[in-house]
């Protein structure tokens, strides 16, 4: 089971969009996928058509109350795709976990109890480097970093790499940079091309070949509670995320 944390402490880089659409594209390619939403905004939850208001238990109950993960998993309307939803209650979890025993291991322990045979677990991390993200990185065996092709992108990445190295040293020696994904690209602008070049130079073969362009369809899909592959199957966004999913499978 490959456990991939989609992580960047910088907001607005296409993290949740990538979590939803990578998970849905892997499921479309007949892989059994569990999406775990660990962002208190719960946008990955609503993005796959789950009503946030109708949820009785969420990732909050798993991390704070140590509820069994199998009791929280929900089947989505999409074949091969299940979700552990998030809720606004998670916003207070950081404080509640501070004094908890083995606080960084809660997610890892929960995932080890999963009954289903998932091929992939995709974790949507919150846009911060707090305890929830640490839990995700401790549980994962790979990190996918979405990086927006804009001026400050590399600055944010160096901060994230710092955290990655700390987690690797103290909490999870098996953690690996699975890939860096260029998002919201616009090949018509110099800055987009320059940043893409810098990221590829720095991360070499860790940078995915696939890039995700800025498109209207991709930004519309979440408000309809659908992954792009359902909302606009023939759009560029759908094709790009499908290509990314194939690259992820190829990388093992």
What are these regions (language model features)?
Residues 1-252:
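P-loop NTP-binding core
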């Amino acid at each position: 089971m490959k456990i991939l944390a989609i992580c960047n402490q910088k907001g607005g880089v296409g993290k949740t969009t990538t979590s939803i659409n990578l998970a849905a594209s892997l499921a479309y390619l007949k892989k059994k996928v569990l999406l775990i939403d660990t962002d208190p905004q719960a946008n990955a939850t609503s993005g796959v058509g789950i009503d946030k208001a109708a949820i009785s238990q969420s990732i909050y109950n798993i991390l704070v109350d140590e509820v069994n993960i199998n009791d929280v998993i929900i089947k989505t309307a999409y074949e091969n795709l299940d979700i552990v939803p998030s809720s606004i209650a998670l916003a207070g979890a950081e404080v509640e976990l501070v004094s908890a025993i083995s606080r960084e291991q809660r997610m890892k322990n929960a995932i080890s109890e999963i009954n289903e045979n998932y091929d992939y677990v995709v974790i949507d991390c919150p846009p911060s480097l707090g305890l929830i993200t640490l839990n995700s990185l401790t549980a994962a065996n790979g990190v996918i970093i979405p990086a927006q092709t804009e001026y400050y992108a590399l600055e944010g990445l160096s901060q994230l790499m710092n955290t990655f190295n700390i987690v690797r040293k103290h909490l999870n020696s098996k953690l690996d940079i699975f890939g860096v994904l260029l998002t919201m690209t616009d090949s018509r602008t110099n800055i987009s091309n320059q940043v893409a070049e810098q990221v590829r130079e720095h991360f070499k073969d860790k940078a995915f070949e696939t890039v995700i362009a800025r498109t209207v369809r991709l930004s519309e899909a979440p408000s309809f509670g659908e992954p792009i592959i359902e909302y606009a199957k023939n759009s560029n966004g759908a094709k790009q995320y499908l290509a990314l999913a194939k690259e992820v499978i190829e990388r093992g």
